[in-house]
Each structure stands twice: as C-alpha cells, then as structure tokens.
Amino acid sequence: PAVIDKDFASAKLAELLDADMLGQIAEIARSVGAYVLCDEVYLPLENTEAFMSMADVYENAIVTNSLSKTYSTPAARVGWVVADEEGSNRIRTYRDYTMICGGVFNDALATYVLEHKDKIVERNRKIVFGNRDIAQAWIDTQHRVSWTAPQGVSTSFIQLDIPEDDEGFCKRLLSERGVL
C-alpha cells in the first residue's frame, strides 16, 4: 500500500498542523487507500490540550514517538508506535527480530520520565521559550537573517540571505571556524 510520510510538528516549518489540515491529509490518504506515517517526536510545548494526533483523525495512521525530544531523554532509546492491529503486529514482529532486549535501565528511566512528564515538559517549555526570545531578539538585529519562529515546538528554520550556496557556506564555516 501507499504511504504518505509526514513529520508533526515539522522541523522545517516549525509549526503544528491543525485539525482541519490533518483532516484534509486523512481524506487524501483515504481516497487512495494510503497509510499516513507520522513522526510526532516534537510534541507541542504549549496548547497541549488542543494537540491532535494523526491517529485521532485517521484509521490508517501509523504514529511514532519517543522520549528523545519533548522529554529530553534520548539516552533512554525508548519510543512507541500507534497503529491498527495489523500494523502494530508487523512492527512488533520486526522489532522483536532486530532487537534482543530494550534494557532494564532504559525501561526504568522511561518509567521515571513518564511519571514526571509534566515537570519535565514545564522545565523544557521555559528553556525553549526563553531561547526563542533570545533568538528573536538577535534575528531582529540581523538584516540577512530571517526565520520561521517555532510555534509551540522546539525547532525552527533559520534562513540566511547570503551570496553563497549552502554547501559552500557550510564548508567555509567548517574550514575557517571549525564548526558546522
């Protein structure tokens, strides 16, 4: 079957899609019998009660998530999938085939994080929104820099108006400054 692959929230767009847009994607997928694969690893940090998952609006959604981004725990290497029964069983079979075990430490850390998720998200919200304000203040002073400010998420897309292609700029930055 066909698959429509979409990240929610989009790291490039720095925004979440609203229920209307999710519904439109679901209708397109439904019209061609496609699954919609969504990585929802960047859950919103504000208006969380209004957030809708693709799994809320489409019966053939496959939604992935993890503790890595919103919960700031990439070391746990723990994630999850929401799908229909057939999809869940296929994914579980593949996971069992490719992974011997998840690790007791990983499970314990994941349990702790989820038990304290509200405190963790509140801490992250303060950091992200504080950094967003700092970035906005700096961008406001730069005539060759613009961005799509993040809307409730921790990622954004910064654009440079420079007379150089991206690859050349990155190579020069690495060569001259030792950073990439």
Task: Identify the residue ranges that each predicted region occupies.
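N-terminal low-complexity segments that are often proline-rich with Ser/Thr-Pro
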Residues: P1-L16
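Alpha-helical scaffolding segments of alpha/beta enzyme cores, especially the outer helices
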Residues: D20-E27, I134-A137, G168, R172
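Conserved core segment of the aminotransferase class I/II
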Residues: I62-F129, Q136-W138
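Conserved glycine-rich beta-strand-loop-beta hairpin in the small C-terminal domain of fold type I
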Residues: T111, I127-Q136, W147-L160, D166
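Conserved C-terminal alpha-helix-loop-beta "cap" of PLP-dependent enzymes
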Residues: S146, Q159-L180
